[in-house]
Amino acid sequence: MQWGLYFIGEIHPASSAQHKWILTATDYFTIWIEAMPTRNAIDSVIIRFLEGHILSRFSCPRKIITDNAAAFGSKKMVDFCHRYQIALAHSTTY
């Protein structure tokens, strides 16, 4: 199972709850999409989203493909993927 993770944003103006980003996850097999508005595009938000919306509902993905945003390559994110034996891949820059 492969998932793609991406942040959409920064959105101007922010929502009434001050959300400026949307974190999206796409299951590449079923094309199922999960999304969550966030205030920040940081690694702790990604990990909380994965634990609460992906791992607990769909099982552990074998691979996560992301863009080259700093939050996806942080030490916390790499450690998280290593702990769950998830291969972390970054798409090419275009």
What is each of the regions a protein language model found here?
Residues M1-Y94:
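Retroviral integrase
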